[in-house]
């Protein structure tokens, strides 16, 4: 599937089934490939794979081979991207090296200190923010801004400019990359 060869994918699926491989194991591998090797290039691939896994549990053999073939061929034919994998690995490395914590203006105001700060300093967001009374003074409610986006710091200070998710140019990720560029250009 990773190599975008639907013929090889369905052939090796048939070989695994012929050898007695558990259909649930095969379905799990298809789900993993859909996320790991396709990712946001075609988000529908994971939905197809999960649906196939659920159907296999209900249907059984011999019909499950058709369901697995459907999913394996879909995933094999989908545009590929490992940007999601790279993003979580980069974020994991940052967690190991970062001392930072969630910026105060993003924290849940369940502590009296944060709630008192919000009350003492007022809220600088726009009217109608349902979170205005429970957040710090710098929080801005994205849905009250054009395109439901507002620039504010979301990462800890020591990694505030980090970029973990770098969408590729295949499939849906090309659109995601363009959207993220558009938002960043608005910030200039």
What positions do the PLM features span?
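Terminal-proximal interaction/regulatory segments of ATP-powered molecular machines
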Residues: 2-147, 155-188
């Amino acid at each position: 599937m990773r190599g975008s060869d639907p013929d090889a994918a369905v052939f090796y699926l048939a070989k695994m089934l012929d050898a007695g491989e558990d259909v649930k194991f095969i379905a799990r591998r298809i789900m993993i490939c859909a996320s790991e090797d396709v990712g946001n290039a075609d988000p529908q691939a994971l939905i197809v794979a999960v649906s196939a896994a659920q159907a296999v549990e209900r249907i059984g053999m011999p019909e499950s081979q058709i369901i697995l073939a459907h999913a394996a061929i879909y995933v094999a034919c989908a545009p590929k991207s490992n940007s999601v994998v790279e993003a979580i690995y980069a974020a994991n490395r940052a967690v190991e090296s970062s001392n930072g914590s969630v910026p105060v203006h993003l924290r849940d105001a369940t502590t009296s200190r944060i709630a008192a700060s919000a009350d003492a300093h007022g809220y600088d967001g726009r009217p109608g923010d349902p979170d205005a009374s429970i957040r710090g003074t710098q929080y801005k409610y994205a849905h009250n801004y054009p395109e439901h986006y507002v620039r504010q710091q979301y990462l800890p200070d020591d990694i505030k400019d980090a970029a973990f998710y770098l969408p590729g140019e295949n499939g849906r990720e090309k659109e995601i990359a363009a959207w993220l560029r558009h938002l960043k250009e608005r910030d200039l």
